[in-house]
Regions:
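Glycine-rich phosphate/diphosphate-binding loops and the adjacent beta-loop-alpha structural elements
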Residues: 312-321, 325
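N-terminal core-entry segment
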Residues: 9, 26-313, 496, 502-505
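Short, well-ordered loop/turn and helix-capping segments at boundaries between secondary-structure elements
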Residues: 12, 256, 265-276, 293, ...
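Intrinsically disordered, low-complexity Ser/Thr/Pro/Gly-rich interaction regions
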Residues: 323-474
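Flexible, glycine/charged-enriched surface loops at secondary-structure junctions
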Residues: 66-67, 90-92, 274-282, 339-350, ...
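C-terminal segment of classical bacterial N-terminal signal peptides
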Residues: 19-22
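Conserved acidic/glycine
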Residues: 9-10, 432, 462-463, 469, ...
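N-terminal secretory signal peptides and thylakoid transit peptides that target proteins
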Residues: 1-14
Length: 505
């Protein structure tokens, strides 16, 4: 089989073709003892890591479509706001105490504080802050076969290391945006290429793919050649890790932050002459084989920047600080409440149906902390009915444990619905049925939440979200407004160090 043919194969076709060819060769592939299922074959394709590195090294800013640049600005602005707000999260003070214990000395900005640190530790703390509230952007999946319809959080692993290195080097806004887009594109296409097994078996995609994105962004800012960029990917892959069991705990954002730190360190070590496997993506004992079992090389050989992930299938910006799988239901619930003027004291019960994948991920059915509430469909429905809003102030322990909130949570029945299941993982359908005490039933359904490519937020919408994040962080209004305007015209900024004073207390 020729290398170029692999890029055109689906998982099913790839499995069938490889098993047939190996059987013809007398390898005995597909003959598994004791009735066990034969694992999917692993593509024998060389040069994948090299191709990704070439994309990072050779892509010019002018190659990025203008609409992709503008979409990226929204995610960058959102990321800055969440970095500020994340220092007020429960994990924020702990991370700062941890930073103190490291005795880190450096000039890199720890956003939302008066502190500075060495670049790699600033990247760690800033990344944890962005992901702390689970309020950051998400990558949609391009294929129905991919589990859960979304793949990873693209900005949290990439923006912090890219920003601290741009700050260190005095890079321009254009240079930062190019590095950011390359990092996001690499991590998202790696996530897209992996077999669903990686996520299904418990790997946290943002944590295992994020180091590649961080390394890609920093490699471009450091102007590494192809060889050293390949080495950086080898280091990043070997340092990657993260598990879904940590969802709903502080360790979920720590996994993402650790990946940002590791991606930065990988580039610095590669620059200094460190060695690593230079074919880590496709190697027999490499990244894809270890975490996913198999993958589709076409996403990395043919589809980097063709189209850009921001262009298709798109990146969603969250209007609510909860798991993305809650957002279609939250968007529909908010619309139903407004349309029918539903009051909490009128509600007898709420029924929410979703797919098996959604139900298994939103596993906090009896939440008692703000973190648990982020992965609780029951809480998300309850708080909208009680307060008609669900922002950062609502996802706090004290709010979750209020008697009226707990009582409303018990009225919400969340379950697997056959119609939602049949819609497919790419739709994330939620079906809502509100029964009032009068007997009236109000119902609706939605497959896409506000902020998704199907229902996008404008730059001004994201600016309003940023203002809310800044207010939650008690950030000076004048600084917040200046950040909004600087990001709006980021490509005209000659030196990213102009942002330092605005993001540091």
């Amino acid at each position: 089989m020729r290398r170029r043919d692999f890029g055109k194969l689906s998982f099913a076709t790839l499995a069938s073709t490889l098993l047939t060819e190996e059987a013809r060769a007398g390898s005995g592939a597909g003959s598994v003892p004791d009735g066990k299922t034969c694992p999917p074959p692993f593509p024998k394709v060389e040069g994948v890591t090299a191709h990704v590195a070439e994309f990072v090294v050779n892509t010019r800013y002018e190659a990025i479509p203008q609409n992709v640049i503008e979409l990226g600005k929204k995610s960058i602005l959102d990321g800055f706001g969440l970095a500020l707000a994340g220092q007020r999260a429960e994990s924020g003070p702990i991370m700062l105490r941890y930073l103190d214990s490291l005795e880190s000395v450096g000039k890199s900005t720890v956003m939302g504080t008066r502190r500075s640190a060495s670049p790699e530790f600033a990247a760690l703390v800033n990344s944890v802050a962005i992901h702390a509230e689970d309020f950051d952007d998400t990558q949609l999946s391009a294929e129905k076969s991919k589990t859960y319809g979304l793949l990873m959080h693209p900005t949290a692993p990439v923006l912090p290391p890219a920003f601290v290195l741009a700050e260190k080097l005095g890079a321009s806004g254009k240079e930062l945006m190019l590095a950011y887009h390359l990092g996001v594109e690499v991590e998202c296409k790696i996530a897209e290429s992996m077999a669903p097994r990686a996520y299904e078996e418990g790997f946290h995609t943002s944590a295992i793919c994020g180091p590649f994105g961080a390394a890609a962004a920093c490699a471009r800012l450091r102007k590494l050649d192809v060889g050293k960029t390949r080495i950086a990917f080898g280091l990043a892959a070997s340092a990657s890790g993260g598990l879904r069991e940590e969802f709903g705990t502080m360790t979920k954002p720590f996994q993402v932050g650790h990946g940002a730190e590791d991606g930065y360190a990988a580039v610095e070590l590669a620059r200094l002459g460190w060695t690593a496997a230079d074919n880590i993506i496709e190697a027999e004992r490499g990244f894809m084989r270890a975490v996913a079992g198999t993958y589709e090389p076409k996403w990395l050989l043919e589809k980097l920047g063709a189209p850009w992930t921001f262009e298709w299938p798109g990146v969603s910006i969250k209007p609510y600080p909860s798991g993305s799988l809650t957002h279609p239901a939250m968007t529909e619930m908010a619309d139903l409440i407004k349309e029918h003027d539903v009051r909490a004291d009128q509600v007898a019960s709420v029924d929410v149906g979703a797919s098996q994948n959604n139900y298994q991920t939103l596993l906090s059915h009896d939440p008692h902390t703000g973190l648990e509430a982020k992965f609780s469909m029951e809480f998300c429905m309850a708080i909208l009915l009680l307060e008609r809003k669900a922002g950062l102030p609502q996802f706090q322990d004290a709010v979750v444990n209020r008697a009226d909130v707990q009582a409303m949570i018990r009225k919400v029945h969340f379950h697997v619905d056959p119609q939602a299941q049949a819609a497919g993982n790419d739709k994330m359908m939620s079906i809502i049925r509100i029964t009032l005490k009068s007997g009236q039933v109000i119902s609706g359904h939605s497959s896409f939440g506000k902020g998704s490519p199907a229902n996008p937020m404008s730059y001004d919408d994201v600016a309003d979200k940023f203002r809310g994040s800044a207010e939650f962080a008690r950030w000076p209004t004048a600084k917040a407004e200046r950040i909004i305007e600087l990001v709006r015209t980021l490509e005209t900024q000659s030196d990213m160090r102009k942002m330092t004073a605005l993001l540091r207390g």
